[in-house]
Amino acid sequence: MSDTLLNPYFGEFGGMYVPEILVPVLKQLEETFVAAQNDPLFQAEFTDLLKNYAGRPTALTLCRNLTKGSKTKLYLKREDLLHGGAHKTNQVLGQALLAKRMGKTRIIAETGAGQHGVATALACAMLDLPCVIYMGAKDVERQSPNVFRMRLMGAEVIPVQKGSCSLKDACCEAMRDWAANYETTHYLIGTAAGPHPFPTMVREFQKMIGEETKRQILEKENRLPDAVIAAVGGGSNAIGMFAGFIEEKSVQLIGVEPAGKGIETGEHGAPLKHGTTGIYFGMKSPIMQTKDGQIEESYSISAGLDFPSVGPQHAYLNSIGRAEYVSITNQEALDAFQALAQHEGIIPALESSHALAYALKLIAQNPDKEQLLVVNLSGRGDKDIFTVDKILNGGN
């Protein structure tokens, strides 16, 4: 792996564990990415799209009511206001521009909650690229508004009927497609995971979240936050937020994994704290797996967090103690979802609700503590209203 331009590892995690046929493709992607990072014309086009198409910078909003009775100031980084409804749009625009630069004529992607699929579909529509989205059949059912959006923008959505019919199966199908069609096709991975250079590339295309937050909080409060908190599935919204603060040792980085129905039930999606290191999805990282090395089913009420592994940089930050990783149950996330809607008039995605729930837990544990917290509100909850309605009104 010494002949890559960038270090493919974060400590022991990461790497490029793919069929030999894909190694030259990944190296071409890395070369194109490195060249683009140093090309003022590429950067200008990317910045222009972020500003005039996606709507950056996004707001940093102070919660006026949620923290009443405490001494905490809680801010939300409003990635829900981005075009497409979530942080996914940031890095999709970057990767789609790279695909055009490489001369690729077709885009494929996997999606869980559908947000990455929507972001990919909108970028492909705007850049005139055909796209195919792989989505677990279970997720197609629970995220129907996003499926309609993708199809409306011209994407072909393929429901994956294999395995658990969820995100991990969609990832496998997309990888198979890519191995068969790599000459014409770019696989636009939706998170900061997968084989090198994806974890590094996605972080770089998401790091404006943390950079903007840092500027905005200094402007508003004249100091850095005590902690930044973000939900972790594959980990792209969290690494985008953390990237702006990793060097600021006074700022605690808190990643929130889904505890699902409770860690003790086994029905969760928390591989960082409750998995073991292995090889999956082209990388070495913590995975939920059996003693025989079979991938276990992950579970979360939130389709976007329902993933049995995690990005390698998160694994590294956890291993060196720079970031802390915790977990939140479905019920806690649902409570936070409702609390934000009722007290602040903002409907968060169920993914982001996990991060918010942990912030609310911190506040409740010590209401007299003066603290400044920032939650990355990675997406809006329009896509989740039917799921939540079903649960609150007597569904599962």
Swiss-Prot record:
It catalyses: (1S,2R)-1-C-(indol-3-yl)glycerol 3-phosphate + L-serine = D-glyceraldehyde 3-phosphate + L-tryptophan + H2O. The modification N6-(pyridoxal phosphate)lysine is found at residue 88. One of its GO terms (cellular component) is cytoplasm. GO terms for molecular function: tryptophan synthase activity. Keywords: Amino-acid biosynthesis, Aromatic amino acid biosynthesis, Lyase, Pyridoxal phosphate, Tryptophan biosynthesis. Its EC number is 4.2.1.20. Pathway: Amino-acid biosynthesis; L-tryptophan biosynthesis; L-tryptophan from chorismate: step 5/5. NCBIfam families: trpB. The beta subunit is responsible for the synthesis of L-tryptophan from indole and L-serine. Tetramer of two alpha and two beta chains. PANTHER family: TRYPTOPHAN SYNTHASE (PTHR48077:SF3), TRYPTOPHAN SYNTHASE-RELATED (PTHR48077). Belongs to the TrpB family. This is Tryptophan synthase beta chain.
